[in-house]
Design a protein with these regions (language model features):
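Short glycine/serine-rich loop segments
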Residues: 1-90, 97
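Amidase signature
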Residues: 92-178
Length: 178
């Protein structure tokens, strides 16, 4: 019982609402796990615990049976130990085959201005190495700009509004559960 501990460093947090799922995969307790992501809850725990977390496009994976937070922004996706396993599990969850060989010369947009000052030294070095390796895989890297001023405020208001509407009754009847 108690809080979930980070699989890499138990003195650190597991990274969010799907942290237990990420830790279970990282420690080999399970081969894969399902997470939900409204604002990073698949990707952040995956990054914190050294596993692969994939947030599929909105609507690709059904949320039937999941307890919603924000119907407009909720996603479900896999946490696995490899990209191949994430691809395979996403196919199962989506109920359709997703061909890998169909991608020719992908282009990666990288918002370097947005990332400036947000990455630690070691993460920045690893990310730079990745960007340098992509052209050898016939991928193009383009610097892009993400004008995100004000987007976060709108996003958080939407999520809070929808969460309040969805959970209003339960919050009134069982506040201790929140």
């Amino acid at each position: 019982t108690g809080p979930v501990r980070n699989a890499v460093d138990p003195s650190r947090q597991a990274g969010g609402s799907s942290g237990g799922s990420a830790v279970a995969v990282a420690l080999g307790i399970g081969l894969a796990s399902l997470g939900t992501d409204t604002g990073g809850s698949i990707r952040i725990p995956a990054g914190f615990n050294g596993v692969v977390g994939f947030k599929p496009s909105y609507g690709r994976v059904s949320l039937e049976g999941a307890l919603p937070l924000s119907r407009s922004t909720d996603h479900a996706g896999p946490l696995t130990r490899s990209v191949r396993d994430a691809h395979f599990l996403t196919e199962i969850l989506a109920g359709e085959s997703i061909p890998l060989e169909g991608v020719q010369n992908p282009v990666f947009g990288v918002p370097l201005d947005f990332l400036e000052g947000r990455l630690g030294v070691e993460v920045r070095k690893a990310f730079t190495r990745l960007l340098e390796d992509l052209p050898a895989l016939r991928a193009e890297v383009r610097e892009v700009s993400l004008p995100l001023e004000g987007v976060y405020e709108v996003y958080t208001r939407l999520v809070r509004y929808e969460a309040a509407r969805i959970h209003e009754k339960a919050l009134k009847e069982h506040p201790e559960g929140f």
